[in-house]
């Protein structure tokens, strides 16, 4: 079984201080997770406005950036499976990013998509693929591998035949760029996540797992319900088929990430419920 991990972004509301962070990481470990995926902007202090904006977007990052994450993950007995960053930071100083990743004992640096960026423009996507190749080559020279993490924006069509993700797959060099696939976001975007995973094959090094469904009790006003993320095995995604594909290509880690709609509004309770689904694959 690959390393079972949780993305740090899921934990923003329960990392308010050192003691709370210790308790959260201990609960993760006790639930059966062996790893954590760190976000560059959550392991360093960030400004109040950034925290405010991410909270307003429904994805609070919390105040954990001032904590000693090297000490926290070591004390919890967790493996750092990757470090999330942005392409701009890589282009400015790839060595610094690589050194930070290696200081946590991980070989993977992950680009989490582009902001204020037109994924529907074909020329822009060709350029992005070239930039990723260059950044990946710079990281490889430092002994670190670059992965690209998708959301749903990569499903935009750049022409009648291809989507943005097609260009990334076809024009990035596997020597320098591979992928962390998020099946939730492609499912949310209306795509066949399994087919894309099969197409990625062994270029999928890490897998972000989540489920999707409806959390409701009692009667509904209309027959159309809003769907959102759910604990693993409680939604409607065919996770068993996705897991079989991920295991068949030898992914290094299966990483839980959800941003909201947690049971009892608790990310810790949510990851504990999801851990029960993952236990069948231990």
Model-assigned labels for residue ranges:
Residues 235, 242-243, 253-257:
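H/E-rich (His + Asp/Glu) clusters that bind or coordinate divalent metals
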Residues 1-108, 178, 276-282:
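N-terminal pre-domain/capping segments
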Residues 255-267:
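A short, acidic, flexible beta-alpha connecting loop/helix-capping segment that sits on the rim
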Residues 36, 139-236:
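Acidic/histidine-rich catalytic cores of soluble enzymes
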Residues 9-11, 25, 33, 84, ...:
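Tryptophan-centric aromatic hotspots in well-structured domains and transmembrane helices
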Residues 25-26, 66-70, 94-98, 129-136, ...:
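Generic structural signal for well-ordered alpha-helices
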Residues 79, 84-178, 268:
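Active-site acidic/histidine proton-transfer and metal-coordination neighborhood
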Residues 8-12, 39-41, 85-88, 114-116, ...:
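Active-site beta-loop-alpha junctions enriched in small/polar residues
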